[in-house]
Amino acid sequence: MAIERTFSIVKPDAVAKNFIGQIYNRFETAGLKIVASKMIHLSQEKAEGFYAEHSERPFFGALVEFMTSGPVMVQVLEGENAVLKNREIMGATNPAEALAGTIRADLADSIDENAAHGSDALESAAREIAYFFSDDEICARTR
């Protein structure tokens, strides 16, 4: 199997509840390595740019407002089938529909404040990683 990289955000709701460590533990327990990570407070411009594909959707304004409401953790995860594995760890977008044991089922309160974001494909992962990290901020995990 090929080693992939994917992008993840621990959203403001999960950061505010001190769930960063629990979420990182789930990544690592599933065999994903964290190869880049930083805490940032998204500006409106940065959030609007990241979610630009949703700009015409009715929830766009509320999404940007939520994502700028507090700090987030952005990270690059690496491992076999990283994109799919991370999406399985996160669970369904709506926590009410997420399987027990997933981040969203266990740690999220609503579809609007659902604790985590994860890339949905290799192409979006590459774009999202480049949006937040330069190549020299990503560290190879050779040990």
Swiss-Prot record:
The keyword ATP-binding applies. PROSITE patterns: NDPK, NDPK_LIKE. It is an enzyme of class 2 (transferase). Keywords: ATP-binding, Cytoplasm, Kinase, Magnesium, Metal-binding, Nucleotide metabolism, Nucleotide-binding, Phosphoprotein, Transferase. The gene is ndk. Its main location: cytoplasm. InterPro entries: NDK-like_dom, NDK-like_dom_sf, Nucleoside_diP_kinase, Nucleoside_diP_kinase_AS. Its cofactor is Mg(2+). ATP binds at residues 11, 59, 87, 93, 104, 114. Coiled coil: none annotated. It holds the Pfam family NDK. NCBIfam families: PRK00668.1. One of its GO terms (cellular component) is cytoplasm. It catalyses: a 2'-deoxyribonucleoside 5'-diphosphate + ATP = a 2'-deoxyribonucleoside 5'-triphosphate + ADP; a ribonucleoside 5'-diphosphate + ATP = a ribonucleoside 5'-triphosphate + ADP. The active site is at residue 117. Homotetramer. GO terms for biological process: CTP biosynthetic process; GTP biosynthetic process; UTP biosynthetic process. This is Nucleoside diphosphate kinase. Major role in the synthesis of nucleoside triphosphates other than ATP. The ATP gamma phosphate is transferred to the NDP beta phosphate via a ping-pong mechanism, using a phosphorylated active-site intermediate.
